[in-house]
């Protein structure tokens, strides 16, 4: 479960940082 949402959160955070 966590292994499925982890990449989603990582991608979201990366998108916010690499604005």
UniProtKB/Swiss-Prot annotation:
Spell out the protein name for this chain: Hylin-b1
Reported function: Has hemolytic activity against human erythrocytes. May have antimicrobial activity.
Q: Which GO terms describe its biological process?
A: defense response; hemolysis in another organism
Give yes or no: UniProt keyword Secreted: yes
Q: Does the keyword Secreted apply?
A: yes
Q: Which organism is it from?
A: Boana lundii (Brazilian tree frog)
Which classification does the entry list for the species? Eukaryota, Metazoa, Chordata, Craniata, Vertebrata
Q: Which tissues express it?
A: Expressed by the skin glands.
Q: Which residues carry this modification: Arginine amide?
A: 19
